[in-house]
Amino acid sequence: MSLFLTACDDGSDGSTGAAGVDGTDGIAGVDGINTNNGHLQQIGRYASGIFDDGGAEIVAFDKSTNKLFVVNSGANTIDVLDISEPSQPTKLTTLNVADQDAVSFTSGGANSVAVNNGLLAVAVEADNQQDTGRIYVYNTSDNGFVTAFTAGALPDMVAFSADGQYLLSANEGQPSNDYSNDPEGSITVVDLSAGVASAAVSQATFTAFNTQQTALTDAGVRITGPGATVAMDLEPEYISFAIDNDTAYITLQENNALALVDLASATVTGIVALGYKDHSLQGAGLDGNKNDDYPVILNQPIFGMYMPDSIASYEFNGKTYLITANEGDGREYIYDTDSTTCTNAGHTDLGGGECLSHSDEVALEDLALDPGVFTADQISELQDGSGWGDLTVTNTNGDADGNDQFEGIYAFGARSFSIWNEEGEQVFDSGDQIEQIVADQSPLFFNLSNDKNSPDNRSDNKGPEPEGVAIGTVGNRTYAFIGLERQSGIMVFDVTNPFSPAFVEYNSNRDLSVDPGEGVDAGDLGPEGMIFISAEDSPNGKALLIVGNEVSGTTTLYQVQ
């Protein structure tokens, strides 16, 4: 077992050097971009009829049957769509995971789907989220149930390796709302090399790192849960694979870190701290003020915690590169109880029968800033009625000396996408480009929420929230498609050379003339799951991007041309 500790400063120095070596080739390549190759044209759309309740989340495609499997968490089912004609997606049937409940297991709903070689895998949480979940396996040909594998607590994402040998689930292990039960996060590794019937199931855990908590936190891994061990606090979120299918990369979103898993041994071999984004640097600004109702992107003495949600991988010059969507995610746990029980537990009574057991979020205006680090003018600008005081930041980072005065300000997410090498070193970050592009192309509808059309509404809380990422090749170019959850748009970047990506286009299928409360007529809201289908595998012979939109409950098919 090895432990990778990548501090912010050391990681930045390494990344800069790498970019200098390979960047020259990238410039020549970018000159040849044909932006039409990255153009997204909507050709089909399916509406689940469920609005603002997860009607379309994660999507998976089976090329042998032209079926699309869509997680419909609002109905606790998997919608099975026929996309033989992509312009007319048609619902064939639904799979109800509750049909497979047994005496020893009661399902709480499906969270994720993946397809490989005629098999559909579904990540299923237990009715009690802190209990062990399951991976259900079905045949894609007849939708018949095949088997179930025991996973960890709250399997949130499921994925096959490209060669089909391994099936993994990222088991988030979230605590109960009253924080009385905090199960360990883990990764379930199913070895399918001997076939489904003879599969070997292993649980890759983090218990070996429990004795290394100080080293991890010193390196920048966030271990912040009350009384939590390392294994309890780490929350695996999303999965991608190395190009040789020997290693899996798992985002640990709340921990601002990346886990490396050796698949052959089903062992976590490293935890990499992802560092922090310096928003005071040119090209890395942010708009943290929602009160001016207009985009004003500034450099401020604030750090962004990358905290990626989705991750995807691709090959460049024989090596694996990882792309992350740096959404950010705080922790806030609220449960229902009376005020006496709440206060006796040492928790915060919110009134109305609600009790706060734990939160790592605070408004910037409520953070005591160290006057020895921040000037009086900076403190005034950030806290005294300027609008920046509403910015959501954390109360668990920035007070290194423990004197209750914060030397650093740390916000959730980085409002960007990043590219990392196999060692978890950053080789590219999009800086403030996403906010700048939306500000330029849609200034009156900047940093919207996905459930209201109020401009600047999300500037104080993670901005456009880049959440989803898919990678695909069209011709000789490789593109990254970045889903903006709150803004409800898709950014397209040419990432053929990971050291010098280039912006291609911004696409939004949201109708801003319609109030989101009016339902499906508002267009596509809240892109969650995204997959790229190559022209070779596509039903119409054209490259496709398919997006599940969780708020509008729609599944949208784009042709990439």
What are these regions (language model features)?
Residues 33-561:
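Beta-sheet-rich non-transmembrane sensory/scaffold domains
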